[in-house]
Amino acid sequence: MDLTQLSCEDFLSRLASKAPAPGGGGAAALVGAAGVALGNMVGNLTTGKKKYAAEEEEILALNARAEALRKRLEALVQADADAFTPLAAAYGLPRETPEQQARKAAVLAEALDGACAVPLDIMDACCEGIRLAADYAEKGSVLALSDAGCAALFCKAALQASALNVAINTKLMTDRAHAAALDEKAARMLAEYLPLADEVYQSVASRLRA
């Protein structure tokens, strides 16, 4: 089943159910995609306007990046579900003999690594989404300024949610050095892009209330 082809109602119903997917990872990717789409909307409302003719080429370039990024995040909704399948299978392997225990440990380590790769990719995409939101807030139509702020907040939420999805998997890794490296990668993205998202929000809020 391709989760991205579900209706909004069906996706949310499945998210609320006991089904293994979608879960927090797929939901985070979808929220990030929505944030990027909001930014793209700001761009599309800006192009073709005489008032923003000087920014036309730059906005068109931002729109191209946003469209590609949205599609990337949409694909990550399904990728997160696909990554859960081998992880669930690994937990179900027998471990009665030393050989079975060794095999289960190896398979589980590989599955956990794969389960971390997707949320890290979502985080990377959300960082780009926050950068785009900052540009749209600065250069886009003032009539859609609030949407640029929403774009930053959506991507921020998805970024933080994905960091939690990294942490729940690294916590279970027996290779603690590798786990620490993945946690550090996530922490670096949070440290750099959460302040930028907050800056975009504060700037937008101040301009709207001026």
Predicted regions and their residues:
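Short, hydrophobic/aliphatic alpha-helical segments
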Residues: L3-P22
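Amphipathic, well-ordered alpha-helical segments in soluble domains
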Residues: F11, A34-M41, A83, I122-L132, ...
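Conserved phosphate/anionic-ligand binding catalytic regions in large, soluble enzymes, centered on
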Residues: S17-L38, A144-S162
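Amphipathic alpha-helix face/heptad-repeat signature
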Residues: L30-A34, L62, L69-L76, A115-A125, ...
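Transmembrane signal-anchor/signal-peptide helices with a preference for the extracytoplasmic
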Residues: M41-A53
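A structural-propensity feature for long, helix-poor, extended segments
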Residues: K50-A89, M189, L196
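Amphipathic alpha-helical interface segments
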Residues: D80, F84-L153, A157, N169
